């Protein structure tokens, strides 16, 4: 799932996000302000190496003096990486995360949940690829997280983690991991349990005028509580037949149960109750050989029933809606890589994915009852080549032909990629990347179903005519002394689809729907510099400037062509008090931004974390933290474009928390006789 987004720490939740819980059919406006990476380097130690199109970062070194508890938080420390709407972006664009070089059919949300269960002690390093060659089996930007593999050692080690968070209500996280290795086998097990409550408050203001001149003006304030129980499980087994000859199996499961209530008061009253469940199971089998051939298969099962009950005085009506989505998805691949000598490489392969989506909805007012079954097939063939010209210049290019078939779309598309890397001298890297891609809507967003929020005034509707987007990305990255990173980028997305509100001119209702833009264009520059003062104060300064143009010539009766310059500045400071205590401060401020007809006001935040590591080997860690200390990072939406009037102000308390991490176990002597061998939602 690839979305063109701008830099953002701004819009994490919108009105309809509450109405649908964790559903993607809720109003989740794409975030606007890019929250930039935390890059911290001690002294002049290199943190990045170049291999072909990949920049390999010493991620354990980057997170050494940061209050990072899991792989997801660790990835956010990479240059150019940010988090928006609980998703990762790289240089203002969405990014695919892989584990040990293996693509997956899991959705981004499911993969992020898995990353949050992986302890940082398992991380070896991370590869950043701005234009992934086709041999990676994914398109666009890629972060490849590489884990530690210790086959050849007898080892038993693990980690226990407990976390407490308070944001007006309490939430808890418990996590356990275990890794066992011997001569041939590697077995890792992860389990995480999250539970608790979340509270937030928002204010709404609406002014609505119909074509007959009738006007309405009303405002509400809302109290919202969510309760969640989330289980995440992973079992991974690697069997090494010989050097670089491996058979691996992985099972991942996520079970989520959410209940919530939302009470509106003001010019009208309403009560919304939601109960959403989901279960996800993923099975994967991979086989790799020492002569460059690899194959694999994967099956994913996803089932998500939910219920919504809404009673409102606005229309004196009760809405009782039951929805369900089941997805079965299969994926298989074959690929081959050759070393042709004289620094030439050749690769080619085939991928096939098929899925079956069965969705249904029952509505007491019969407005959107229905059952749908949609089959989707996707097959791609690719060929790629790489060449090194001496020690300073490398180039890699690939071409993928993809066939995509649904009941609506039946298309062939070509996707070229190109990456050129030049090393003028030690510690200096210049890299140019070109990437073409196509982004497809989620299953649920194209269903002709309806749900409600804001006392029934807001309707979240599907769009069966939604088209895939066509994306082009160019970037030029310069790394100085293996520490200072700058990136100039251009992103163009034709038929980009985003969800926007619209106040009808025919009746008193507001509609939220994914619509296709003509285009979304971005030109931006990111600069990141670590600055150390002695051995006790480490800093990182980041600045990003972006010009964005959003155009939609067919958005109801409100066509728009809007442009905006905006920027963000961020400072991250780490103060070292001896060898065992460190204090982290993270401050950010951004200017006004836009998204379609939405205006996003300026805001900022200050976070602090105090970490105590009493043992030399960091086996024990205690962390206390407070995010958004001054409560200035609240999310607000303003839509006053050409007669529309929607003001949403969402308020959150500062987040306070404690976490405890304990690592146990270690390595035993290596066996010298053996060779040391080593990756949906609605």
Describe each region flagged by the PLM.
Residues 20-22, 614-682:
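C-terminal beta-signal and adjacent terminal beta-strands/loops
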Residues 21-63, 83-85, 92, 140:
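Short, acidic, small-residue-rich periplasmic hinge/interaction motif at the N-terminus
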Residues 27-28, 38, 71-74, 111-113, ...:
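N-terminal periplasmic accessory domains that precede
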Residues 104-131:
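Short acidic/polar hinge/loop motifs at secondary-structure boundaries
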Residues 169-197, 213-261, 279-283, 289, ...:
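Transmembrane beta-barrel wall of Gram-negative outer-membrane proteins
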Residues 185, 230-258, 271-427, 482-488, ...:
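Face-selective signature of the C-terminal outer-membrane beta-barrel domain
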Residues 438-487, 492-494, 512-523, 532, ...:
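Outer-membrane beta-barrel signature, preferentially recognizing the C-terminal barrel domain
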């Amino acid at each position: 799932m690839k979305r063109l987004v701008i830099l953002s720490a701004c819009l994490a939740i919108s009105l309809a996000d509450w109405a649908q819980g964790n559903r993607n059919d809720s109003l989740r406006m794409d975030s606007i302000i890019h929250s930039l990476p935390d890059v911290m380097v001690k002294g002049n130690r290199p943190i990045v190496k170049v291999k072909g199109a990949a920049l390999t970062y010493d991620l354990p070194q980057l997170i050494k003096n940061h209050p990072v508890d899991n792989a997801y938080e660790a990835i956010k420390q990479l240059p150019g990486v940010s988090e928006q709407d609980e998703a990762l972006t790289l240089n203002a664009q969405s990014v695919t995360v892989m584990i040990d070089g293996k693509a997956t059919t899991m959705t981004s949300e499911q993969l992020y949940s898995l990353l949050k269960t992986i302890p940082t002690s398992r991380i070896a390093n991370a590869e950043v690829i701005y234009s992934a060659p086709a041999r990676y089996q994914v398109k666009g930007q890629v972060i490849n997280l590489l884990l530690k593999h210790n086959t050849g050692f007898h080892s038993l080690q693990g980690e226990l983690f407990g976390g407490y968070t308070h944001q007006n209500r309490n939430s808890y996280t418990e996590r356990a991991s275990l890794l066992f290795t011997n001569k041939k086998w590697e077995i890792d097990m992860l389990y995480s349990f999250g539970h608790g409550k979340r509270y937030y408050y928002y204010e709404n203001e609406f002014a609505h005028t119909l074509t007959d001149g009738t006007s309405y003006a009303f405002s509400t304030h809302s109290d919202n509580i969510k309760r969640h129980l989330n289980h995440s499980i992973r079992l991974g087994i690697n069997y090494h037949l010989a050097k670089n000859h491996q058979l691996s199996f992985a099972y991942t499961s996520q079970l989520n149960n959410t209940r919530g209530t939302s009470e509106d008061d003001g010019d009208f009253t309403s009560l919304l109750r939601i109960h959403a469940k989901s279960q996800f199971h993923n099975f994967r089998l991979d086989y790799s050989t020492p002569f460059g051939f690899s194959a694999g298969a994967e099956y994913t099962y996803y089932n998500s029933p939910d219920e919504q009950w809404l009673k409102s005085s606005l229309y004196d009506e009760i809405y009782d809606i039951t929805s369900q989505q089941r997805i079965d998805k299969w994926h298989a691949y074959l690929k081959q890589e050759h070393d042709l000598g004289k620094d030439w490489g050749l690769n080619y392969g085939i991928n096939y994915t098929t899925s079956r989506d069965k969705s249904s909805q029952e509505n007491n007012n019969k407005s959107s009852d229905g059952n749908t079954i949609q089959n989707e097939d996707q097959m791609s063939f690719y060929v790629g080549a790489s060449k090194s010209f001496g020690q300073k210049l490398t180039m890699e290019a690939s071409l993928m032909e993809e066939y995509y078939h649904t009941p609506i779309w039946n298309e062939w598309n070509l996707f070229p990629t190109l990456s050129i890397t030049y090393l003028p001298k030690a510690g200096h890297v210049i890299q140019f990347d070109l990437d073409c891609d196509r982004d497809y809507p989620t299953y649920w967003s194209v269903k002709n179903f309806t749900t409600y929020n804001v006392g029934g005034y807001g309707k979240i509707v599907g769009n069966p005519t939604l088209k895939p987007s066509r994306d082009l990305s160019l970037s030029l990255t310069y790394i100085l002394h293996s520490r200072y990173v700058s990136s100039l980028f251009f992103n163009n997305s034709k038929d980009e689809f985003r969800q926007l509100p619209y106040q009808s001119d025919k009746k008193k209702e507001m509609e939220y729907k994914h619509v296709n833009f003509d285009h979304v264009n971005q030109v931006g520059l990111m600069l990141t510099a670590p600055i150390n003062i002695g051995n006790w104060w480490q800093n990182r300064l980041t600045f990003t400037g972006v010009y964005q143009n959003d155009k939609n010539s067919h958005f109801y009766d409100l066509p728009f062509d809007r442009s905006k310059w905006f920027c963000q500045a961020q400072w991250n400071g780490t103060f070292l008090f001896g060898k065992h205590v460190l204090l982290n401060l993270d401050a950010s401020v951004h200017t006004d931004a836009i998204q379609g007809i939405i205006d996003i006001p300026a805001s900022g935040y200050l976070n602090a974390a105090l970490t105590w590591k009493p043992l030399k080997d960091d086996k024990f860690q205690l962390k206390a933290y407070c995010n958004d200390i001054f409560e200035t990072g609240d999310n607000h939406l303003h839509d006053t474009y050409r007669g529309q009037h929607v003001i949403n102000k969402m308020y959150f308390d500062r987040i306070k928390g404690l976490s405890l991490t304990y690592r146990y176990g270690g390595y035993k002597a290596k066996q010298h006789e053996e060779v040391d061998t080593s990756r949906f939602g609605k």
